[in-house]
Amino acid sequence: YEQCIAHYESPEAAVAVVHALPRINRMVLCYLIRFLQVFVQPANVAITKMDVSNLAMVMAPNCLRCQSDDPRVIFENTRKEMSFLRVLIQHLDTSFMEGVL
């Protein structure tokens, strides 16, 4: 979690965090990101009105959970969590999942 929050603005660092995950965790996350990448295609956004920012806002709390009980920390990290997920949707290469999804 802390690495995700620390690298929420850097596509290269965010992708490196994903590649450092255990294989099964990485595969599940890549599957989810691939699914979200399908949704952010312009034809789908035109119908759903769910662009990359909206999807990141909805999905970030399901992927990243702040361990702090301090509301200020939780509030500050929420923006970083959404940014991290948005970066992954925009930059993570999930082409190897092509036949799976």
Curated annotation (Swiss-Prot):
Cellular component terms per the entry's GO annotation: glutamatergic synapse; postsynapse
Tissue specificity annotation: Preoptic area and testis.
Taxonomic source organism: Rattus norvegicus (Rat)
Transmembrane residue ranges: none
SUPFAM superfamilies the UniProt entry points to: GTPase activation domain, GAP
Name of the encoding gene: Arhgap39
Gene Ontology biological process terms from the UniProt entry: postsynapse organization; signal transduction
InterPro entries reported in the protein's UniProt record: Rho_GTPase_activation_prot (IPR008936), RhoGAP_dom (IPR000198)
Site keyed Arginine finger: positions: Y1
Name used for this protein in its record: Rho GTPase-activating protein 39
Ranges for domain Rho-GAP: 1-96
